[in-house]
């Protein structure tokens, strides 16, 4: 790809699309933080060991604070955190957004119609949550929160698809930086800001006042209106004819059926193995129990058979036909990249592993080092947010200027190497100057890496299935880092912070190797295509 001038790179931020993505990013960050309750505060206050691996950075979890202040049991608050699964599995219903246009609202276009529906549900849901007192209407509050979570996840899908369709690959980083800026500002406002508002309206840990939380949630619901207005004003991205034809391939009933079959499959497979593990096969092998007696007496064996039948039903020819709307985008990705898809999926699954695993224990590390909460809030939260946004902006600028792969490599290298700064900080105690330096470089590299990675993911998707493929790839991006992050506390307890930060830095090496391999392959591909293009131009 030919390099562009700095003026052309800066021009990427001057387009109206960047302002649109800024407002849409604000709309995406607002409901996520207001609804997605975490357990970090509960676990830390209850004295649970660090092996729980919960990110202390989500201490400003608004819904959990509200529920706890209202006197709701910790166990119930813990179950309420499962609402966040809507964001993890949003790829399940993403084909609906690719292949079905809503009635009535469909006149706005495929992307805008889904955005209007999702944003309207979020606004009404947040206001409705505000009028539900957890002390009296807890079930209603949780039910509405579930609706808001699914609507918010649907909004995320539509925004990502819209972003992919309005700009070229090299411009995606600038749009991603703008989106990230709006998202992070909304996240800060919806967490710390919401708590300040609730306390300002008269609700504290010592004197719960429902009307204060009503005012807070109604206010934040109304703050979604500018995003809804933006959706109504902005233009629908152009849809190629081939995409329109593919959208009509599956009917709405078939698409709903595919979502149902996929959910059954996702539930049945792990449940099948769990019940087989719990079945008492030893009684048959060593005690002479018949299989019929085992079936009649062991409920786990009966459930295992049931889940096995459901799994095979989903994988049968009829089940695969039902899954076609979901499998088609996946098959398209595999057919386009073939064996290379393994390398790409490995790169995607590990790119954010180094900084994500480290980030799980970062704020707990600050406390254990002896930093005050004011220092953590000022340096890590506020100053760190500024450096992250600066890094994202610089990343978008550099990608337009130099291309995606060089900046993707630099982002991966700096994200892993800055973990060494935490290693040095671990030997220095509560050194504020070193903390500022560490946070500056770490968040700057994180922002740069994020913008580069979003641009790279965007370049891998097919516009026919932009919503589905991007939702799936972004889920893969988070899966392995979050799983490993769950054991970060165990590593710290066993090996200490010094070795923990060294290990997280080394986790970035496989990713860098895969980036180099993919980068070299793209260079070879570009060299082989140049003579073909020159030959086609010379032909009369």
Region annotations inferred by a language model:
Residues 460-494:
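A late C-terminal transmembrane helix in Major Facilitator Superfamily
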Residues 39, 153-167, 448-462:
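Intracellular juxtamembrane helix-capping segments at the cytosolic ends
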